Amino acid sequence: MVSFVALIPLFPIVGFFLLLPLGKKLGYPKAGWLGTTAIFLSFVASVITWVGLLARTGTHRVFVDHLFTWMNVGSLKLGIDLYLDPLSMTMVLFVTGVATIIHAYSIGYMKGDPRFHQFFVYLNLFVFSMIVLVLAGNIPLAFVGWEGVGACSYFLISFWFEKPSAATAGKKAFIVNRIGDFGFLLGSFLLFYWVGSLNYVNLFGGHLILSKGSATAIALLFFLGAAGKSAQLPLFTWLVDAMEGPTPVSALIHAATMVTAGVYLMARLAPILRLAPTASMVIAIVGVLTAFVAAAAATSQDDIKKVLAYSTVSQLGYMFLAVGTGAYVAAIFLMVTHAFYKALLFLGSGSVIHSMHDEQDIKKMGRLRRYMPITSVTFIIGWLSIAGFPPFSGFWSKGDVLTAAFQKSPLLWLVGALTAILTAYYMGREVMLVFFGDSRWSAISGSGHQGGHEVGEHEGDMHVSAPHESPRIMTLPLIILAVLAVLGGLLNLPFASSTRFL
């Protein structure tokens, strides 16, 4: 099993280095398929590793694959170590799985873009960085992956840098995240100063000795880092502007990489949070306030992608609410199910934008279910999932979070429940305005792409005058994600103990 672990990050970085010199020569669609294959092979290696890990029990489910020594300076001893446990394997499974689907979708969506190959160069590097963050066996190596996803988000958000708004959004994301990085670094320094190690085996392998004050300071500093990366109050504004990037980038950032990094970090540091009840309560309060404020903001948005952007901020708030109340499994469970339905919703919005010739104003849409049956049905499934309707995956995962919140504080539960009602409302509003009602798109011009090009496949060389279903390379990923959004709740059902892995 260990021999397959190193292959998980190896395939994406090999894809990156192959696409750098060969991508332009390969062109469309070969460059896209090369990048997609690299991520798919990483997913296969993840599945094989997961099966091997599943066969183990207890402490045997935690082990380290030491590749080589990185630093050995005084008492600081660090290696390039891959840390395997149920948490890291759960993360790497959904990261590589969802990323594979998004890569395949991008082949159709980015057709015609002059820098088609460059897009997949960045995507492969993005996924590699996230895998390094998740599998890192020590905090400094995790920080390398942490910075890697930050850099790649800058490249991809500002991919259409010809648009001033895209270039500005990329810079904003990069700068805001530097604020969080300060907390990550300072927390790392204090942890090493007080504990004497930054290796996970030493930190979490036995009894962690920290005073309550020290644990609180470290936890809050790492939470500052997580708040920047995972868009919590007041550092969430960059994520809304990140919609300037191509829609597959939005799906990747919001579902599988980047914003999930902060939640993962806090779940990984759970032994420290258990020693810091004050910090945990701060995390829960910030999380539930972020969830409510973002949900309220989403109710007034008319841009199809900005509704989803605020929705992501809100759902991340739920995850931090779970972390703050000590429900770490519930936080990761929500993260996994959220990856399924949020990737589905973003890719579905991309299908709509593609069909509407770049129009993103939901008040200029309507009745698209008649012209886009696959997109409409799958998008509705995503809506039912995020709204928490049974038996869709969001019902089970969000229910776990609210249960934990009620046990901690009825007030936290009340705000979380109100947020759930707002979520059902603003997503229902988007569905109704886009797919139902009267057609409001007759005035849309079919003369060409606007501004920075939301590029997709066209019929011949001309834009069609009426909306149309997207090509199969774009609709098949929607169907797969819709199935996962329906069945994802089976991963952690309370009455099915055999499925409980975390």
Task: Say what each PLM segment does.
Residues M1-A6, L22-L93, G97-V121, Y193-K212, ...:
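Transmembrane helix-loop-helix hairpins at membrane boundaries of multipass inner-membrane proteins
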Residues P9-K24, T100-I101, A227, A291:
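N-terminal signal-anchor/start-transfer transmembrane helix
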Residues Y28-S42, G170-D181, R370-T378, H468-V483:
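Alpha-helical transmembrane segments and their helix-start/interface "positive-inside/aromatic belt" motifs
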Residues V455-H458, V464-L502:
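Hard-cation-handling environments
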